[in-house]
Each structure stands twice: as C-alpha cells, then as structure tokens.
Amino acid sequence: MEEAILAGIGGDTNVEEVVVDTALTMDTAALGQTPIADANTQDSLATITTYVYAHELDFMILEKDVFDYYCNLNAFADLRELLGAGACEALGARIYEKNGVACGITLTDTAFVKQYGITLLDPVIGIVSGSERKEQAVGMLRWIFEENVGVAAAFSAEEYKAMISQEETGRKDDGKNV
C-alpha cells in the first residue's frame, strides 16, 4: 500500500516515504472517559500526538467515532479551504462535516477501501491541519478518488498551489510564479 500511495501522489521514492500504521487501536467508549483508562487507546493517542508534533502526519483514516474525537480537537483542515468549492461539490454527500467544518471525506464503499481491505467501520479521511505537506495530502485524495473521474478532476493542483502561495505570503498571486 505504501508504495502505491507514494506513486499515486507522484512522490519521489529516493527522498520520500509513506508509512501506514495499522497497529494503532482505540476504544471509542474510552475516548469519552476522563481520564482515558484503556491502555491501548492511551498508547495510540500518544503515538498520534508524537506524529503530529513531529510534522510526520499528513492525513488520517479513522472510524467515524474516532474521527469525531479528533474533529472536536480541531485536528483536521477545512477541506473547503484546501480543495475549493468545485471539489467539495463533486464529492457531494461524501464530505463529512463536524461543527460546521468540512473536515473529512467518507470512504465507505470506495474502490480504495475494497482494494486495500480496510475494515474500519464508516472510515473517514481527513488532512491534518498542521501538515506541512498538504499538497501531497490533497494528492492522496485525488488518488483515492481517481476511479471517479469527475471527483478526481475537481482537484486542481494549480489552484491548490495558488491558494498555498496566497496563504504563505498573505497576498494573492497572479498565478504566473506559482
């Protein structure tokens, strides 16, 4: 899966690496407890927190209940800002909103879930708000939905680069030097 993802987003195998960590487990009932008593859930939360602070986590695919936990912590970028109206419109009911933010995309019954045998209940993918590689994370979304040409085409790399340029410089770019 890692090699397919890296190839799918156009990554350079000489300098980039994709790591898929399927060993993390969380008890959704434990997420509602204070303090969290389940040791596996504590370990998984600590691992994810470490990845986030090290800027090593760009997106997460989680069960909806766990995804909600992270949404409540503002862990995910607003996809309306990253993808634009066209992509969000093309995704339609797959856009997952929480607290008025388009924070994820449901993956239930996608070719991606079927091909890789993802067994999560109601899987949702979100781009981590602190990711330093949001363009690659958007590329991941494009790759996941490439079987749906209308959705994949809505992810414009040029529009995304212009948006990032504006975000980093605080000004609108004319698009010529993006």
What are these regions (language model features)?
Residues 4-12, 51-55, 69-73, 82, ...:
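Structured segments of extracytoplasmic/periplasmic soluble domains
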Residues 165-178:
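Extracellular/periplasmic bilobal clamshell ligand-binding domains
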Residues 88-126, 144-163:
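Periplasmic-binding protein-like
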Residues 132-143:
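Short amphipathic alpha-helical coupling segments at ligand-binding clamshell hinges
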